[in-house]
Design a protein with these regions (language model features):
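N-terminal membrane-targeting hydrophobic helices
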Residues: 1-226
Length: 226
């Protein structure tokens, strides 16, 4: 899953104005993937390209106990929440941050082949919806669009910035689904992932700077963001 991971970020920010900023939540949504692609550069976690391993994704994620086990994801969520708490002294913000990070494993469980573990052990889990594009594509788009629509409905501000963000999300997802498959999972592959995550995160920070919750009142609500 790719852009579907950002659905919990939109949901959290739409529900609570005390949640971290949208850009921060975008970091949290893909935090374990940021970590995965970083750790693969050092050979600590490992993946490879195996064409046809699933109908939609050629990645064989055969060793990723630190980022994509349930325990590993929980530890990343706790660590991210701790950073948010240190920066905000808000348990609400920290809790939403942890929720967004932890959601990554649950969403991956839906689409991955059995390559996810509970704590890095031999038993692996995954419902494998990547083998069923007729299900996986509407699922990912539906999650993202429903959460995005909820965020827009719960906030106010100019529509152009969030529309640009949505267009970027859909463009990157289309490239992921329908672009040419990578030949190798090396440094350039990780760099491409970092670039996509980075662009989307910058756009999310921009969007948050232009929007505020509808229940937020005051003369300067459009310029004062949490």
């Amino acid at each position: 899953m790719f852009i579907g991971h950002f659905a919990p970020a939109f949901l959290a920010r739409g529900i609570s104005e005390d949640a971290p900023r949208l850009g921060v939540l975008f970091i949290g949504a893909q935090l374990t993937d940021w970590a995965l692609f970083t750790l693969t550069l050092g050979g600590i976690e490992r993946l490879r390209i195996v064409p046809g391993i699933t109908a939609m994704n050629p990645l064989d994620l055969y060793y990723m106990p630190y980022t994509h086990s349930l325990l590993g994801t929980a530890l990343w969520a706790i660590g991210f929440a701790a950073l948010i708490w240190l920066g905000t002294r808000s348990l609400v913000a920290a809790s939403w941050a942890a929720f967004v990070v932890a959601s990554h494993w649950v969403l991956d469980l839906l689409v991955h082949r059995p390559d996810l573990t509970l704590a890095g052990g031999a038993e692996k889990y995954g419902l494998g919806l990547w083998n069923f594009p007729i299900v996986a594509i509407p699922l990912e788009l539906g999650l993202l669009l429903l959460a995005y629509g909820f965020y827009i409905a719960r906030t106010k501000g100019p529509l152009l910035p969030p529309l640009i963000l949505l267009a970027a999300l859909l463009l990157f997802q289309a490239l992921n689904w329908f672009g040419s498959e990578p030949e190798h999972a090396g440094a350039s592959f990780s760099a491409t992932a970092f670039l996509a995550f980075g662009i989307l995160t910058v756009l999310a920070f921009w969007v948050q700077s232009t929007r505020w919750h509808k229940n937020h009142v005051g003369l300067a609500v459009g310029s004062v963001q949490r």
